[in-house]
Amino acid sequence: MNPTPLKVWIDSIRSLLCPPVGNKLLFGAGQHKVMVVGGPNVRTDYHVEAGEEFFLQLEGDMELLIIPRAGAEGLVIPIREGEAFILPAHVPHSPQRRAGTVGFVMERERLPGEMDALRWYRPNWTVLYEERFACVDLGKELRPVIERFNASEAKRTGEPPPLGEVGAPPSNDELEPDAPPFVQPINLRTWAADARSRGITGTTPLWGPGAPAPRDTSEYSIIAHIGAENSEGKWSAWVKPPGELFLYQRELWGAVAVRRVGDSGDGEERVLKENDVLLVPAGAFEVRVSMEANAFCLEVTNPRIKQ
């Protein structure tokens, strides 16, 4: 449970971020699936899952193609460097990444019975080909589906396979309910600078309970910690997270103290340098954080996941 220097880690695996998917898992053994995705990555497939996805663009810009509801025309959501975006559950989406760009994507572990889908559309936005699968590591699971589609009659003819065959679109799509509200990406650096200019420090919800509507309906809870000018080194109260806790030190330095539930001591302190990330396991720990003056850290949990 030590911090990982994110930029150093990305440089160490950059050569592995290659088509057709370009994913590399940073954390994946527990509740959060945290991955880094590199370009070029221009895809024709659309991914669908039953949970939300958290996008944060680290290097360069990307575009996220989405289908807001069944039969609707595709839309483009630009996500620029430094911006964060939460994609609502069940929305078909196709990430488009240019060469030299790097982004960070977080998904939750799948609940019992949940299935992911990978699909391709015809020009009239009806489904041409679809496969469903139990998802553990997208970086490994998408490639064989893409290869099967590329070798399929559906790709050659532009007609979907008959019902019952591999790739046949389902007759009733429970993965795709009515379109949820979409919230535009947030530029984190701009948001933090604006918060400081208005004297907002401490803990502020960005998504989830306590966040401005409609971001308050998110299943993710994403909280910003900003260090105050006059309270450097002040610790927050001890909190028991609702599950795995992910921390990303965006600007300057901070620290996190971790102790087992039931202990009364100060816990074990870990320094968070700029661009460090840390994953605290679920269930047995309490945490508190401290930010130096003007520092900015993101805290991510997903209360929907049961411990």
Could you describe each region identified by the protein language model?
Residues 84:
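Ferredoxin-like iron-sulfur electron-transfer modules
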Residues 1-81, 92-307:
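Jelly-roll (double-stranded beta-helix
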Residues 87-91:
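N-terminal extracellular ligand-recognition/capping segment immediately after the signal peptide
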